[in-house]
UniProtKB/Swiss-Prot annotation:
Pfam families: Pantoate_transf
UniProt keyword list: Cytoplasm, Magnesium, Metal-binding, Pantothenate biosynthesis, Transferase
Subunit relationships: Homodecamer; pentamer of dimers.
Protein's name according to its UniProt entry: 3-methyl-2-oxobutanoate hydroxymethyltransferase
Predominant location category: cytoplasm
Enzyme Commission number: 2.1.2.11
Gene of this entry: panB
Cofactor(s) required, per the database record: Mg(2+)
UniProt source species: Paraburkholderia phymatum (strain DSM 17167 / CIP 108236 / LMG 21445 / STM815) (Burkholderia phymatum)
CDD domains: KPHMT-like
Protein function: Catalyzes the reversible reaction in which hydroxymethyl group from 5,10-methylenetetrahydrofolate is transferred onto alpha-ketoisovalerate to form ketopantoate.
One GO biological process term: pantothenate biosynthetic process
């Protein structure tokens, strides 16, 4: 099928993301779970494809990401990788797969052998030794702080994080700890815009926001959300880019443009 052919643009690598941050070019990331969408998103200019454990929600109908398994992430990673996208492929480490550094490494190896070029895990200071262990063994790491969906029961629901002075201070410590341990990318979810801006200012590595304001180095959304495919109430940080567009490709291109020119997210999408 022609839509699975390689694109002509140069590969987006981990060093390329750092160069984009230093040049002030915004990074556009979307979740992706299969080869067809990987090819389409790559054609639209998306910089990074995240095989997120959000597949538990949007593909499997789960109420949380907790039931998603390593084998499932590996399967969808391989599907995305077969499209040979120029975009950087990042794969989530599911709940329970990185409790120890050794477990994290063994499971990260499986994802990278499936086609991941970077792995993402959720946590803060407590995760520093694991991140360091992975990076020392040539596993690029994207850390995820703020609202970490795998901690939904500990949080008592999907709630904005860092709203209190102590909570904000902890998120700053978590973010610095992840960078100091060697993480090369940081996702920040559902936190006050001012806090996310301060984290971005303090760190050297790129920050990717989802409900974290426009001052991050880039943005990520769940693909289904930005296409308007969400049951029930639309999350505050989501914009339906499919509205007014003639095709999915055009909608994704509109998302990329909005991220790059800083018009998304707007104040109505932030906390």
């Amino acid at each position: 099928m022609t839509y699975l052919q390689e694109t002509s643009r140069s590969a987006v690598t981990v060093p390329k993301l750092m160069a984009m941050r230093e040049a002030g070019e915004k990074i556009a990331m979307l979740t992706c779970y299969d080869a067809s969408f990987a090819a389409l998103l790559d054609r639209a200019g998306v910089d990074s494809l995240l095989i997120g454990d959000s597949l538990g929600n949007v593909l499997q109908g789960q109420s949380t990401t907790l039931p998603v398994t390593l084998d499932e992430i590996a399967y969808h990673t391989a599907c995305v990788a077969r499209a040979k996208p120029s975009a950087l492929i990042v794969s989530d480490m599911p709940f329970g797969t990185y409790g120890t550094p050794a477990d994290a490494y063994a499971n990260a190896v499986k994802l990278m052998q499936s086609g991941a070029q970077m792995i993402k895990l959720e946590g803060g200071e407590w995760l520093a030794d694991t991140v360091r262990f992975l990076v020392e063994r040539s596993v690029p790491v994207c850390a995820h702080v703020g609202l970490t969906p795998q901690s939904v029961h500990a949080f008592g629901g999907f709630k904005v994080q860092g709203k209190t002075e102590s909570g904000a201070a902890q998120l700053l410590r978590d973010s610095r700890a992840m960078q100091d341990a060697g993480a090369q990318l940081l996702v920040m979810e559902a936190m006050p815009t001012q806090l996310a801006a301060e984290v971005t200012k303090q760190l050297r590595i790129p920050t990717i926001g989802i409900g974290a304001g426009v001052d991050c180095s880039g943005q990520v959304l769940v693909l289904h959300d930005m296409l308007g495919i969400f049951p029930g109430k639309r999350p505050r940080f989501v914009k339906d880019f499919m509205q007014g567009q003639p095709s999915i490709l055009a909608a994704v291109e509109a998302y990329v443009r909005a991220v790059k020119d800083g018009t998304f997210p707007g104040p109505e999408h932030t906390f």
